[in-house]
Amino acid sequence: MTLGYLGSLNDLSLIVVIGRSNYKKSSESLDALVKALHASGHSVCWFENRQTQTAKLLEDKFERLWGSRVSKFCKHNFLIGNLLRKTIKIFVLLAHPTRWGYFLTVFKNSNQRIANDLRKFLRHFPARRIYLFSHSAGGIVSSLAEAEDSVTKLVCFGYPFKHPDQDEEPSRTAHLKKMIKPFLIIQGDQDEYGSAQDSKRYKLSSSISVVPIQADHGYDNLSVSEYQKCLELLEKSLTLP
């Protein structure tokens, strides 16, 4: 389930990156921060869950077999073309029984299942100090995996306290009041999933600190000053006992 790594996977300390549920919405600024941490001497590994792996498999097979033809059709018939795209992907998925669990992600919250996969993933490494670096839904997943012995600290950019188009979902926040390990949440003042000020509505453990920055939920194209602020926060968090 690893997407890639920088440095050695045999180091006694390791940063594990857990991204957004939508792998297409990555952040160049956060990628740059991760690379900067590696440049300062930290080994880094990316975690890729089964849901993301399956989504990439479907997208790859679709694009190779039908992508160009459907894309041309979609230009003139967007709604029908989009439905056709999803239907084709379903048939591709049916040909891969080991991936059928992907269907479940449509009907129920999959964060706990992904967190269980993350905990199993972490046990493959000899590292005694693992730092979880996450973005958005990756923050929910990493916080649910906090109890893993090797996990030392957590950091999340844009914890998704509340989906902007949905009612409150306790599964996103109820466990946060019970967290024990240091959890740094860096929250944008324009984050539609909740700002640092909005986070005060929830019961958070004393081990959680929420720091505001100027950003939206994408945390991309950070200004030079905000980027430097984030890098200093991360480096300080990693060096403190």
Per-segment meaning from a language model:
Residues 1-127, 131:
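Serine-hydrolase catalytic machinery in alpha/beta-hydrolase-like enzymes
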Residues 22-24, 163, 189-194, 217-218:
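Acidic catalytic loop of the alpha/beta-hydrolase fold
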Residues 42-47, 205-219:
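Catalytic histidine neighborhood in serine/cysteine hydrolases
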Residues 55-57, 216-228:
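Catalytic histidine-centered segment of alpha/beta-hydrolase-like enzymes
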Residues 133-142:
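Gly/Ala-rich beta-loop-alpha elbow adjacent to hydrolase catalytic centers
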Residues 178-180, 185-187, 191:
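Short beta-strand/loop motif that positions the catalytic acidic residue
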